[in-house]
């Protein structure tokens, strides 16, 4: 139920303070953004709440920034020494660090973001095991490299199935049960038809991906469940992307806030939740978690798509 004009005020203040503070305000800007978006997202006329703080995210931001700064300075030193071999080693270590930190960042993201998300006073939570996720990630990464990217569809589904199936909403549990084969052929069809139609099919392709993710998600409690069903159409995607592009281009980027609100409004308005769970019977079971390292790591690396 957010309004572009209201969110625009949040975004402009965030931009100004982030620039003035040379980026240091960014975690607090992120806090204000998430709190606005959560507070304007409703289920059965009750809003969601984000209780994370800029201070928590700033600590995570500093940790991530420090790691990247160390690697950058090491590479800069190697480059200035004109030692080609050392520069190559540092560069390889940098890329290895990026690939290696992803599963830890995903785990940390879910632990923090879920514990800071609530509805009707009931917190979400994440019960996944870090070592299990790390082993799964590196196994699938190896197979993806070995198959020149073909296995990436199975890797994506394995990660989504594991992480989302370990998300809790109080005493209720989420399940994401998708098949890598189905996802592979969905992507294969989408890529081929998008290429043949010179990009026109991309709207149907994006619709299929989004609907696939939602349609395999469910929430379970006391032998009862609710399922998620997305009714997003290719026309919805086309209208959303074209109008958002026009808004952003003709406002020189200032219309980002309006585009973001339009996107979330469209996505949630097309999402149906149906089933027989008694939401009032769900009880608080999840503890707080204040380490925002994973949340900031995914943000800094712009890898939110992996979740």
Language-model features, listed with the residues they occupy:
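Loop-to-transmembrane boundary segments
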Residues: 4, 53-66, 129-146, 180-192, ...
């Amino acid at each position: 139920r957010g309004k572009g004009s209201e969110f625009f005020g949040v975004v402009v203040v965030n931009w100004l303070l982030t620039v003035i503070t040379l980026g240091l305000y960014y975690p607090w800007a992120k806090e204000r953004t998430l709190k606005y978006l959560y507070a304007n997202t409703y289920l059965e006329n009750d809003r969601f709440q984000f209780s994370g703080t800029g201070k928590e995210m700033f600590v995570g931001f500093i940790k991530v920034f420090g790691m990247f700064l160390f690697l950058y300075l090491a590479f800069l030193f190697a480059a200035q020494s004109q030692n080609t071999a050392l520069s190559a080693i540092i560069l390889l270590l940098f890329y290895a660090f990026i690939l290696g930190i992803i599963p830890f960042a995903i785990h940390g993201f879910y632990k923090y973001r879920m514990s800071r998300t609530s509805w009707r006073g009931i917190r979400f939570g994440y019960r996944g095991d870090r070592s299990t996720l790390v082993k799964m990630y590196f196994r699938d990464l190896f197979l993806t490299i070995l198959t020149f990217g073909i296995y990436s569809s199975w890797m994506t589904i394995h990660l989504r199935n594991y992480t989302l199936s370990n998300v809790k909403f109080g005493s209720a549990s989420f399940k994401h049960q998708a098949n890598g084969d189905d996802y592979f052929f969905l992507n294969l069809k989408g890529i081929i038809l998008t290429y043949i139609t010179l990009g026109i099919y991309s709207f149907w392709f994006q619709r299929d991906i989004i609907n696939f993710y939602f349609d395999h998600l469910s929430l379970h409690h006391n032998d009862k469940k609710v399922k998620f069903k997305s009714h997003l159409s290719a026309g919805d995607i086309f209208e959303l992307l074209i109008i958002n592009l026009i808004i952003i281009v003709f406002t020189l980027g200032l219309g980002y806030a309006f585009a973001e609100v339009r996107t979330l409004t469209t996505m949630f308005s097309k999402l149906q939740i149906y089933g027989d769970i008694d939401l009032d019977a769900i009880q608080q079971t999840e503890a707080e978690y204040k380490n925002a390292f994973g949340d900031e790591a995914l943000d800094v690396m712009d890898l939110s798509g992996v979740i």
